[in-house]
Regions:
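Class I S-adenosyl-L-methionine-dependent methyltransferase catalytic core
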Residues: 1-127
C-alpha cells in the first residue's frame, strides 16, 4: 500500500504499478499517512521514502516522530521499511530497527531500515 498527499504522485505511482502488472498486489491512495490506519488483516508491508531535509522545508525530527507514532498505533502486525539519508532524524522514529542496510540513493549516503511492528509488546506477540 502507498500513501501520498500529492495527487500527482499518487497518479504517477498508480500508472507505474499498472505498467509493472502489480495492481492486484499494490494499492496507492491519496491520503495523509498520519490519518491512516491498517485496513487489512495479517501482515502488511509498508515502504517509506520520506522527505529528506534537502527535499522539503519541514521539522524533520517531528516528522519522523509522527511516522513512528503512526506506525506503532495504527499498523500492528506489520513490517515497515524506510530509506533515509538523515541518520539523526531516524533516531526520532522511536522504534527499534530489526535490520539496517547502508546504501547510496543517487549521491546520498542512506540507510534502509526495517521495523517489525507488533500489537502490544514484542514479547507478548511471541507468546
Amino acid at each position: 500500500m502507498g500513501f501520498d498527499k500529492a495527487p500527482s504522485a499518487v497518479s504517477k505511482a498508480k500508472q507505474n504499478i499498472i505498467n509493472a502488472n502489480l495492481d492486484e498486489f499494490i494499492g496507492v491512495h491519496h491520503v495523509n499517512f498520519f490519518n491512516s490506519t491498517k485496513e487489512v488483516f495479517g501482515n502488511t508491508t509498508i515502504l517509506f521514502n520520506p522527505p529528506y531535509g534537502e527535499r522539503l522545508n519541514i521539522d524533520v525530527n517531528e516528522f519522523y516522530k509522527k511516522v513512528g507514532d503512526t506506525l506503532k498505533h495504527n499498523y500492528p502486525n506489520s513490517t515497515a521499511w524506510m530509506i533515509t539519508s538523515d541518520m539523526q532524524a531516524l533516531k526520532h522514529v522511536g522504534l527499534r530497527t530489526s535490520k539496517r542496510i547502508e546504501l547510496k540513493n543517487a549521491d546520498l549516503d542512506c540507510k534502509f531500515v526495517k521495523y517489525e511492528l507488533y500489537e502490544g509488546t514484542r514479547k507478548a506477540s511471541k507468546l
